[in-house]
Design a protein with these regions (language model features):
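Transmembrane alpha-helix interface/packing and boundary motifs in multi-pass membrane proteins
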Residues: 228-233, 256
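Interfacial loop-to-transmembrane junctions
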Residues: 245-268
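Membrane-embedded alpha-helical bundles of polytopic integral membrane proteins
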Residues: 1-227
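Final/C-terminal transmembrane alpha-helix of multipass membrane proteins
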Residues: 265-282
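Juxtamembrane boundary at the C-terminal end of a transmembrane helix
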Residues: 198, 202, 278-286
Length: 286
């Protein structure tokens, strides 16, 4: 427990440091590095051999290009980049002549795609909500996404310990309970509304958040987002657990002592980040 607490404190300090670089290319580079580490964890979990390093290496330029390019450039590049990537995987399977399984290659491609979309969401928020025009709204929403994920996990943990009686998904995650999940949903909604209220007051955004361009208060939308995000966070956690069980591993990595790897810490963020980003950018900042 002591190791977990120390790691969490260090992680929070690092997160604060990274957010100070938000308006620079350093932020994009950090996100790209985190993404590549996560993809490498997938590569290792699926049991690829060293001679299959190309399977991972080909994802490096794809990831870097995505994280370091502007949104307008990405819109033009995503189709040709995806075509080249999928074609490479198909050719590689043929060249290896059946010595590498289609299931493993597909798993790497799909799981990596989920991870890339997850972390690209942070870059997209930066691009679509520039500091010069919207202040630090993008920083707030990135932190809100993490708050949805990790705050929901915390609420679910304590609610489960206090009231948990009915197993949620015993085969995949024996410790998760229905009561814990409900506590996580309610806690996430409260976390979201309180965090939004604090930010809107501190950043003098009360009027903008109260009277959104769709006629619905941002606080109402955040509460609804929190509810859906909590469910997506639980699903992301279960999805990552299923993969770990099928791969026969306990953790995806050891980069966070006491917590595991990047994917062990960001599993609940995987589906929350793209969802919240799409809603926020499409509804409030269209």
């Amino acid at each position: 427990m002591k190791t977990r607490i120390i790691t969490a404190i260090v992680g929070i300090l690092v997160l604060i440091g990274v957010m100070f670089t938000f308006n620079t290319m350093v932020f994009n580079l950090v996100i790209a590095a985190i993404t590549l580490i996560a993809i490498h964890e997938i590569y290792s979990a699926l049991g690829f051999e060293k001679k299959d390093w190309l399977m991972y290496a080909v994802l490096v330029p794809y990831t870097l290009l995505g994280m370091l390019s502007s949104y307008s450039a990405m819109r033009k590049l995503v189709m040709p980049m995806s075509f080249v990537l999928v074609t490479f995987f198909a050719i590689y399977l043929v060249v290896r002549n059946g010595t590498i399984s289609y299931q493993k290659a597909s798993g790497l491609l799909v799981f990596s795609g989920i991870v890339i979309f997850c972390f690209y969401s942070f870059v997209l928020l930066k691009e679509r909500l520039p500091v010069e025009k919207f202040g630090y709204d993008a920083v707030f929403f990135i932190l809100l996404i993490l708050c949805f994920a990790w705050g929901g996990d915390t609420c679910a943990y304590f609610a489960g310990r206090a009231f948990g009686k009915h197993k949620l998904c015993p085969v995949v995650s024996p410790k998760k309970t229905v009561e814990g999940a409900i506590g996580g949903v309610l806690g996430t909604m409260v976390f979201g509304v309180v965090a939004t209220l604090i930010y809107s007051i501190a950043a003098n955004r009360m009027e903008a958040f109260t009277r959104s361009n769709i006629g619905v208060s941002m606080y109402v939308i955040i509460a609804l987002l929190g509810c859906i995000a909590a469910v997506l966070g639980i699903y992301g956690d279960l999805f990552a657990s299923v993969v770990k069980r099928q791969c026969g591993i306990k953790d995806y990595g050891t980069i966070f002592p006491g917590h595991g790897g990047i994917l062990d810490r960001f599993d609940s963020v995987m589906f929350i980040a793209p969802f919240v980003t799409m809603v926020i950018t499409a509804v409030f900042y269209a």
